[in-house]
Amino acid sequence: MEYEHLWLTAYGCLAVVGAVVVYCAIKQSLVTNWWFYGSIYPQVKLMADRTTFKPFEYPGCYDKWDTHEHAHWSFKELNMQDDVHDWHNRLSEAEKTFLVQILRFFTQGDVDVAVGYVQYLQLFQQPEVRMMLFSFGAREAMHIASYSHLISTLNLPDVTYQEFLKYKAMKDKHEFVFNSRFKSTTVGRFFNYLLFGYDTHLEEIAVKIALFSAFIEGVQLFSSFIMLLNFTRHGLMKKMGQIIQWSIADETHHTNSMMELFSTLVVENKSHIRLGVLEARVRDTARKIVQLEDGFIDLAFSMGEMRQLTADDVKSYIRYITNRRLQTMGYLPLYSVVENPLPWVEDLLNAPSHTNFFENKPTEYAKASLTGDWPW
């Protein structure tokens, strides 16, 4: 009798668990989702496959692709001989060390960014969204080749590309991008959705966009941009500065566009995303990115101040721009830096003069919506 009682108790518990599972499955529409979408999880419009090119679901993404395609450039437009002369004759040994420290991770930084676009393309399947992502990813290839061209122009050895792994500040930046904490498990995702109705996979995607696009493209790269542009500010390495200015125009467009995609993903799926948890994770990611960048800045400035630019100047700037990225995503700023601490950056970028690749004559880089005020 005692064993029968235990068996009945066990069967009763299983029946209760089964009833709860069935109830949750019905509540979360698991069967309906599977029947219509081939997945137990709710359909995400941004990730839905569409056979035909039109009508567009996201015409703004097509417009961003079109804008981007009106602003092509190539490092081959530039004759780098003046920069070679500056390197050999006008830069101090401390300045050369400073420049090399930045270049050690500069190309790798965009290699890491390109990985983000490869991952985005596997997720977002609407044709106009993919057009935007393809265009942005292709431009990252130009950035990588251009930054590599800077290294080759200065006749630095190929080992330069691996040297970042020897420096903790650089290696930590690289490894953080691919940290496992940005991945959700299949089992965890299933039970969280079954019991509570939120999809951790969507949260991970949103955090990943914030990581790659808002904080790596939009903060970390800008730290290096500013340190390199300080040479151009003083009439040095001007062709390098030209490449940086072109890259800034691109990265600004990429960052703003991807933060808009972030907002679209969250708004369209807010019933399946823990908004408070997402905000906390995005803010935590921003803090970590700034912390890692502080270490990199200290390493770069290990030889001291560089022509009216200090490590504290750059640290203040990245906090300012981090606030701007957070505000664009709809979050409150993290840091007390309200005004741009480096106004010369804005002055330098608002009056660029470039070279037309086909005509080889000066022209303003003022195409489509890349014109106008810079967003910082």
UniProtKB/Swiss-Prot annotation:
Annotated Fe cation 1 binding sites: D110, E140, H143
Entry annotation: catalytic residues: Y147
Keywords: Deoxyribonucleotide synthesis, Iron, Metal-binding, Oxidoreductase
Ranges in coiled-coil conformation: none
Cofactor: Fe cation
Enzyme Commission numbers on file: 1.17.4.1
InterPro entries in alphabetical order: Ferritin-like_SF (IPR009078), RNR-like (IPR012348), RNR_small (IPR033909), RNR_small_fam (IPR000358)
Biological process per Gene Ontology, one example term: deoxyribonucleotide biosynthetic process
Superkingdom: Viruses
CDD domains attached to this UniProt entry: RNRR2
Reactions the enzyme catalyzes: a 2'-deoxyribonucleoside 5'-diphosphate + [thioredoxin]-disulfide + H2O = a ribonucleoside 5'-diphosphate + [thioredoxin]-dithiol
Disulfide bonds: none
Any single Pfam family the record assigns to this protein: Ribonuc_red_sm
Positions contributing to Fe cation 2 binding: E140, E217, E251, H254
UniProt remark on cofactor binding: Binds 2 iron ions per subunit.
GO terms for MF: metal ion binding; ribonucleoside-diphosphate reductase activity, thioredoxin disulfide as acceptor
Complex formation: Heterotetramer composed of a homodimer of the large subunit (R1) and a homodimer of the small subunit (R2). Larger multisubunit protein complex are also active, composed of (R1)n(R2)n.
UniProt similarity note: Belongs to the ribonucleoside diphosphate reductase small chain family.
Function summary: Ribonucleoside-diphosphate reductase holoenzyme provides the precursors necessary for viral DNA synthesis. Allows virus growth in non-dividing cells. Catalyzes the biosynthesis of deoxyribonucleotides from the corresponding ribonucleotides.
Protein name (record): Probable ribonucleoside-diphosphate reductase small subunit 048L
Organism from which the protein derives: Invertebrate iridescent virus 3 (IIV-3)
